[in-house]
Amino acid sequence: MKTYAQKASEVQREWYVIDATNQTLGRLATQIATLLRGKHKPTFSPYIDGGDFVIVVNAERIRLTGRKPEQKMYYRHSNYPGGFKAVSFKQLMAKHPERVLRFAVKGMLPKTRLGRQQLTKLKIYAGPKHPHAAQQPKVYEPRPRG
């Protein structure tokens, strides 16, 4: 009996919608990364983009534990002298709440072309509305802790 290897043309994608209200950032991001990579499917293959589309609503209501909302920093550099920028979690949530979750999920995906392709299947919206009703997304309930 031969081992089954999925081809890119055989991939069947689902659309899931996740409500981020009162979800912890890291725990939610790991579940999203699993869906995007397709690791929840029995046909998972690390070199095929077999994951599903994920729509996240209410990204502005995501939370962190402890004192992290004040202490967590996001850094970037423009590659120019003196171009180092730092912004706190609170500041980023006030301006662009969807970027916080995107950064967390991006760090959990492969740092390759495949990872960048998988990240394009993530759609994040700060509020409760999204324009993907035509895809008939299924409501995804994150796994309970414990």
Swiss-Prot record:
This entry carries the following GO cellular component terms, namely: cytosolic large ribosomal subunit
Instruction: Quote the Pfam families the UniProt record gives.
Output: Ribosomal_L13 (PF00572)
Q: Which biological process terms from the Gene Ontology are attached to this UniProt entry?
A: negative regulation of translation; translation
Q: Which Gene3D superfamilies match?
A: Ribosomal protein L13
Entry keyword Ribosomal protein: yes
* SUPFAM superfamilies listed in its UniProt record: Ribosomal protein L13
Q: What GO MF annotations does this protein's record show?
A: mRNA binding; structural constituent of ribosome
InterPro entries listed in its UniProt record: Ribosomal_uL13, Ribosomal_uL13_bac-type, Ribosomal_uL13_CS, Ribosomal_uL13_sf
Extract the ranges annotated as region (Disordered): 125-146
Q: Which family does it belong to?
A: Belongs to the universal ribosomal protein uL13 family.
How is the quaternary structure described? Part of the 50S ribosomal subunit.
Q: What does this protein do?
A: This protein is one of the early assembly proteins of the 50S ribosomal subunit, although it is not seen to bind rRNA by itself. It is important during the early stages of 50S assembly.
Protein name in the entry: Large ribosomal subunit protein uL13
Q: Which organism is it from?
A: Roseiflexus sp. (strain RS-1)
Q: Which gene encodes it?
A: rplM
